[in-house]
């Protein structure tokens, strides 16, 4: 296991890799407008970074039925001084379709004037570059036959694919934490095909979608942590664990632990 979860207790794993370039280059005087779901790892990580740099953050959360007290993820963001707005799923989809650019009405409603957009999951050029560093850290040491990781927006997988050489002997296994993530699957599949890299995309069909778990998965997660003393989160890495426990892979297998917030799950 490559333990990127140890990078930072809050800006954990792939989150630091996605965010560091943005915060190096952004205008610290402008509000950051960013987006995520109720159990987004991105929002707490961005909250920590925004507070650290003394910046104002406005977070648009998918799910109009939610509030700042709905779960520890959202409560943490509010406690860091972030301004949270909750929108319907249809409004959120429309924002995604507009590349996260708000309408004039939305800007007025959320009271954002001078702002810069940080896309959902931290996706973008900075994130691709940051996540590409993962490959250079893994390959010289382990030369894996299989590299297995979780995906939400697939930003980490895309960054790794960009960094991998064409015709690589390493097979990439991407375990989606999201049900029916067809756009993300298509982006990863097309990039892998263009570089002649073997990619397996595992859709989230076993548990009902993002944030959904059952007792079998939770038991596997608990048992793994008891045996290894390695905490893993339920939304992403527990589903990688489930995949690895049900598939037989020959050769060196590296599990990329992309971090998460198992601490929040106990609150």
Model-predicted segments: where are they?
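A short, small-residue-rich loop immediately preceding and capping a beta-strand
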Residues: 29-49, 53-62, 145-153
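Phosphate-binding loop/pocket of nucleotide- and phosphate-handling active sites
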Residues: 248-267
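Positively charged, low-complexity intrinsically disordered leader regions
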Residues: 1-31
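Short glycine/serine/threonine-rich phosphate/pyrophosphate-binding segments
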Residues: 19, 39-45, 152-160, 238-241
